[in-house]
């Protein structure tokens, strides 16, 4: 699914996932994200990495107005919703099983005049990538999508397909396991990777990646 399963040791930490709504303020809008831990599990709750990435977008470090963006493994859709509110044209993606829930959050939180800027589409990493034009997006977003090692090759293939030489990838994650570093090492073979933000309170890192370009004069 979309977001990473991990063990919250504090009982209070788990309680927030069982609330039917998670409320946030971004881009001068109140956003109410519907959650459904009981029925849909980890893909249907808002994890810290999504909040940190949405906050980073709101900082204005990345120019969103008019840009073409895609969110991978969107889950509840928070990051894509915020990107649309900040002016991006966003394709918000997840696996087919998650789409109905994802659409409900997107439709509930975008004003009518902004809704045309946000499209929800099915995307399973590594499959049917021909539905998307190569290098179609300026910005690729992912929050807590690095978690299952068996998906790393498909995720990397998907990033390579969606990126042009000028695209920017922003991945927000909490480093929990050695395999998380393994993915970053895989990513660095095809992309230049740098850490651009760290939220110490939530222990979430944001990594920026851009496709490595071969020098034409070599």
UniProtKB/Swiss-Prot annotation:
S-adenosyl-L-methionine binds at residues 47, 73-75, 94, 125, 143. Keywords: Cytoplasm, Methyltransferase, S-adenosyl-L-methionine, Transferase. It catalyses: L-lysyl-[protein] + 3 S-adenosyl-L-methionine = N(6),N(6),N(6)-trimethyl-L-lysyl-[protein] + 3 S-adenosyl-L-homocysteine + 3 H(+). Its main location: cytoplasm. Disulfide bonds: none annotated. Its EC number is 2.1.1.-. It is found in: Cytoplasm. It is an enzyme of class 2 (transferase). GO terms for biological process: protein methylation. GO terms for molecular function: protein-lysine N-methyltransferase activity. It comes from the Eukaryota. InterPro entries: Methyltransf_16 (IPR019410), SAM-dependent_MTases_sf (IPR029063). Belongs to the methyltransferase superfamily. METTL21 family. This is Protein N-lysine methyltransferase METTL21A. The gene is METTL21A.
């Amino acid at each position: 699914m979309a977001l990473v399963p991990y063990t919250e040791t504090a009982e209070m930490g788990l309680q927030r996932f069982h609330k039917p709504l998670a409320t946030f303020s971004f881009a001068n809008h109140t956003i109410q994200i519907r959650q459904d831990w009981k029925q849909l599990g980890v893909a249907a709750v808002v994890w810290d990495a999504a909040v940190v990435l949405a906050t980073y977008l709101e900082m204005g470090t990345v120019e969103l107005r008019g840009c073409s963006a895609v969110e991978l493994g969107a889950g509840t859709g928070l990051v894509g919703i915020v990107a649309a509110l900040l002016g991006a044209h966003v394709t918000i993606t997840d696996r087919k099983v998650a789409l109905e829930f994802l659409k409900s959050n997107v439709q509930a939180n975008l004003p009518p005049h902004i809704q045309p800027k946000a499209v929800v589409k099915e995307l399973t990493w590594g499959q049917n990538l021909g539905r998307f034009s190569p290098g179609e997006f300026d910005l690729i977003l992912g929050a807590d999508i690095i978690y299952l090692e068996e998906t790393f090759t498909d995720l990397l293939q998907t990033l390579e397909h969606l990126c042009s030489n000028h695209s920017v990838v922003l991945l927000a994650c909490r480093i929990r396991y050695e395999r998380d570093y393994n993915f970053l090492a895989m990513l660095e073979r095809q992309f230049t990777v740098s850490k651009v933000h760290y939220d110490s309170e939530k222990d979430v890192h944001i990594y920026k990646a851009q496709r490595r370009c071969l020098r034409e004069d070599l």
